[in-house]
Amino acid sequence: MPLLSSSKLSMESRKEDSEGTAPAPPQKKLSCQCHHHCPEDSVNSTCSTDGYCFTIIEEDDSGGHLVTKGCLGLEGSDFQCRDTPIPHQRRSIECCTGQDYCNKHLHPTLPPLKNRDFAEGNIHHKALLISVTVCSILLVLIIIFCYFRYKRQEARPRYSIGLEQDETYIPPGESLKDLIEQSQSSGSGSGLPLLVQRTIAKQIQMVKQIGKGRYGEVWMGKWRGEKVAVKVFFTTEEASWFRETEIYQTVLMRHENILGFIAADIKGTGSWTQLYLITDYHENGSLYDYLKSTTLDTKGMLKLAYSSVSGLCHLHTGIFSTQGKPAIAHRDLKSKNILVKKNGTCCIADLGLAVKFISDTNEVDIPPNTRVGTKRYMPPEVLDESLNRNHFQSYIMADMYSFGLILWEIARRCVSGGIVEEYQLPYHDLVPSDPSYEDMREIVCIKRLRPSFPNRWSSDECLRQMGKLMMECWAHNPASRLTALRVKKTLAKMSESQDIKL
């Protein structure tokens, strides 16, 4: 076995030990006691050597003490008898040459345990110190990075969609119409790419507020000189924002009688958040606003009615193909949620409550939204809570009831015989300006009343047919109501009979 330790010398050689040297080698053969280190030809645990006798004690892996005795040859023994500490190993050796069997009386002792513990503890202490130092430096660097990033954000304008120099993804000269046509021709059919939407949102300049409702505010803005409408949702209306964005980006959703979707984005920091929905801008405003200030001739009435039901028909119709469109019900149809274009046609807006029909699973995808529709336009099955929420056709028929009321609003503003009524909301003469569920339930469900027709309608064929049409839309029994497609075809025939091109 290798012996790489030094000696504690016997009495005969203590002087040499104090000087750091091994005892002088014997002049003749020396007999030594051997134990655990006996040569094969040894007799009675005895060995002979021309060098030294030794005794060594060492600690094994289990913590026990192992004593070994034997002979060291002259060559190299001087080095082996020197006590050189070995890291992580406790051992000690003593050598002697004074007389035969002198190692019988050698009793080396192990070095104190505290020396090793101190060394190991010192190493652990250094490792801990280094680790703490490195972690502290990293933490300081992270804090500095976060601080400068925060200051950089704070230095930006607080106006959430101020003009920024971020036109990387939209080449100069591209109009909104160009971008939308490109997205449609690309085959995705689900609107502009998200990166383009975010870029547009950043570049919009807010001009003036044009409306405010329970969901938030509507602003007129500009993007590269083009007017756009920016719907800014309250943070409490995030579900409506998400749902409306999702519906607008449904494949094959774009239609001339559905409000044109441009972009959606979320702006803000940890302390404030704003939700934007950017759409086409229509300066005539809602159908409600338009009817309050504008009277109609027969052509104008039919254009408003036909274009509105065309948008509703597109919503209600599912398209089955590799990139199909699900059938969608609006659930909050009213004159304030229909916009009037410059050309006198309508487009349907505000899809925050819309539901989709998943044809693959035959399920209704209802938004997780606490908001409900407008009580004045609610059908009887919603007011008396008899609507089957798991049957998609129930929502379609509920939309048709609401659309019947919208037809009534439009028809009242059509001039016939030089007579026209002031604009009024449905049931204006039967319920308060802000009716409760109970008010509407009593009128619509219990008394089964509907808006009344002016006497002049009976003397005008077109208005008479309109009256018949709306009655078939707001029938008490949902199954008896006309579909949007049926209403669309009827209005088309009425236009032909009046020689009116829509």
Swiss-Prot record:
Residues 149-502 are cytoplasmic. It is a single-pass type I membrane protein. GO terms for biological process: BMP signaling pathway; cartilage condensation; cell differentiation; cellular response to growth factor stimulus; chondrocyte development; dorsal/ventral pattern formation; endochondral bone morphogenesis; limb morphogenesis. The keyword Manganese applies. It catalyses: L-threonyl-[receptor-protein] + ATP = O-phospho-L-threonyl-[receptor-protein] + ADP + H(+); L-seryl-[receptor-protein] + ATP = O-phospho-L-seryl-[receptor-protein] + ADP + H(+). The chain crosses the membrane at residues 127-148. GO terms for cellular component: plasma membrane; receptor complex. CDD domains: STKc_BMPR1b, TFP_LU_ECD_BMPR1B. On ligand binding, forms a receptor complex consisting of two type II and two type I transmembrane serine/threonine kinases. Type II receptors phosphorylate and activate type I receptors which autophosphorylate, then bind and activate SMAD transcription. Positively regulates chondrocyte differentiation. Belongs to the protein kinase superfamily. TKL Ser/Thr protein kinase family. TGFB receptor subfamily. This is Bone morphogenetic protein receptor type-1B. It comes from Gallus gallus (Chicken). The gene is BMPR1B.
